[in-house]
């Protein structure tokens, strides 16, 4: 192989016109050798080039690369590389992801706490991991965090931490970071006094607050946020906390337009929570103030718990039903949810949804996405639904078992008709058989 390469090079040299080269002295050769060695020395790369490379490397590879030379080690500690960091904490015997090494955690706290801006904690299901996250939070006193996220990968382990310990650690960040803009603290024991401290120190900068499933927070705590954080654009909370006063506060003249409101409607046991109704005038005030807001509602209720919902016009845009929902409720949605964009129904029972779907298609003119799982719809009603919606249906996910043959169409014929109305090829989803 080498012989072939050399012969190819020789041919090129021989075919080139002969140019008389000046004789090179010893100094010229040394200069050429030095220039070549400089080009091959990675340590001479400019800081900004190394920085660009490091930004694409995982932390462990970045740490290894930092030991190549002193210059690379200097770049390793440049503040820009430490703006964003995710602490991963787990018990090795029960978790599948690697934990951030304790030595690295201490190095970050000592050398880079002041550089941290986008921080998240990912913990497994163990209480020990959640407590370790709280210990780190309580040490972040010399930082100016902008975004904070607490993530439980399995069950909500932060809920097992003593409330006083969690609140104390979180308060350290709320007090010392004066520019918090995004906070995701769902499934945690945060409470109303903590939110008041957050508001006192970060009311001018807060833009996003996600705190679903926080049982120690009341409507008063959220109302305090809505009243004072005039720049808040995204909010996620549980329905039992939502009140007319909160919606009116979010609709005040001095408040910026709300962009995203997520509401989780959850019940573990029938009758555990008595759900209230939100007045139509409160919803109307929100839509008048923020006409483009996405109102997203996740329902995990039993059928008998839906009485308070959709009796009047509701400006919901995205609806997800995680448990069975009755035909009566779907009928209300068709009449009272004109802004609906997406509807996902996981289960309905054995009664077909023919008239309910057609009503939704006629009245919900913005609907672009539908998902049906454990439901029943006659093939002809489904085709009529798609015909009414037409090509605005950009997402259509229907399990094959949902479609019930009738005297007009079989499930095999449905895909042809539906594809024609959608303007693209469509097939129902099929449950894989393993």
Curated annotation (Swiss-Prot):
LRR repeat locations: 187-213, 214-239, 242-265, 322-347, 349-374, 375-400
GO biological process: entrainment of circadian clock by photoperiod; protein ubiquitination; rhythmic process
UniProt main location, coarse: cytoplasm
Pathway: Protein modification; protein ubiquitination
Keyword DNA repair: no
Domain annotation F-box: ranges: 39-85
Role, per record: Substrate-recognition component of the SCF(FBXL21) E3 ubiquitin ligase complex involved in circadian rhythm function. Plays a key role in the maintenance of both the speed and the robustness of the circadian clock oscillation. The SCF(FBXL21) complex mainly acts in the cytosol and mediates ubiquitination of CRY proteins (CRY1 and CRY2), leading to CRY proteins stabilization. The SCF(FBXL21) complex counteracts the activity of the SCF(FBXL3) complex and protects CRY proteins from degradation.
Quaternary structure, from the entry: Part of the SCF (SKP1-CUL1-F-box) E3 ubiquitin-protein ligase complex SCF(FBXL21) composed of CUL1, SKP1, RBX1 and FBXL21. Interacts with CRY1 and CRY2.
Designated name of the protein: F-box/LRR-repeat protein 21
Organism: Mus musculus
Gene expressing this chain: Fbxl21
């Amino acid at each position: 192989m080498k012989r072939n390469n050399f012969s190819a090079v020789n041919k090129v040299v021989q075919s080139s016109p002969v140019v008389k080269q000046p004789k090179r002295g010893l100094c010229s050769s040394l200069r050429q050798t030095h220039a070549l060695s400089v080009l091959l020395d990675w340590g001479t790369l400019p800081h900004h080039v190394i920085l660009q490379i490091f930004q694409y490397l995982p932390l462990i590879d970045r740490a290894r690369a930092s030991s190549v030379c002193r210059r690379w080690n200097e770049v390793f500690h440049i503040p820009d590389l430490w703006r964003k960091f995710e602490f991963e904490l787990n018990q090795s015997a029960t978790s599948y992801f690697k934990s951030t090494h304790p030595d690295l955690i201490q190095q970050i706290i000592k050398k880079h706490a002041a550089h941290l801006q986008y921080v998240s904690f990912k913990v497994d299901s163990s209480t020990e991991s959640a407590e370790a996250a709280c210990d780190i939070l309580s040490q972040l006193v010399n930082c100016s965090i902008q975004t904070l996220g607490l993530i439980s990968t399995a069950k909500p382990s932060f809920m097992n931490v003593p409330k006083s310990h969690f609140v104390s650690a979180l308060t350290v960040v709320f007090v010392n970071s004066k520019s918090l803009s995004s906070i995701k603290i769902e499934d945690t024991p945060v409470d109303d006094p903590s939110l008041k401290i957050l508001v006192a120190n970060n009311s001018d900068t807060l833009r996003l607050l996600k705190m679903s499933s926080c049982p120690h927070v009341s409507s008063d705590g959220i109302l305090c946020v809505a009243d004072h954080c005039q720049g808040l654009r995204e909010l996620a909370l549980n329905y039992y906390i939502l009140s007319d006063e909160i919606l009116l506060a979010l609709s005040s003249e001095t408040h910026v337009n709300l962009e995203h409101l997520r509401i989780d409607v959850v019940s573990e046991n029938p009758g555990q929570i008595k759900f209230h109704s939100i007045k139509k005038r409160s919803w109307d005030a929100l839509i008048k103030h923020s006409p483009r807001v996405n109102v997203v509602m996740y329902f995990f209720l039993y059928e008998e718990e839906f009485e308070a919902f959709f009796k009047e016009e509701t400006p919901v845009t995205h609806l997800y039903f995680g448990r069975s929902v009755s035909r009566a409720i779907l009928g209300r949605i068709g009449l009272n949810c004109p802004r609906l964009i997406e509807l996902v129904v996981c289960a309905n029972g054995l009664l077909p949804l023919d008239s309910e779907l057609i009503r939704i298609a006629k009245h919900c003119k913005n609907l672009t996405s539908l998902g049906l799982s454990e439901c029943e719809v006659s093939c002809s009603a489904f085709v009529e639904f798609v015909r009414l919606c037409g090509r605005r249906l950009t997402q259509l996910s229907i399990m094959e078992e949902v479609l019930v043959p009738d005297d007009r169409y079989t499930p095999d014929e449905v895909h042809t008709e539906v594809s024609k109305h959608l303007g693209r090829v469509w097939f129902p989803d099929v449950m894989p058989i393993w």
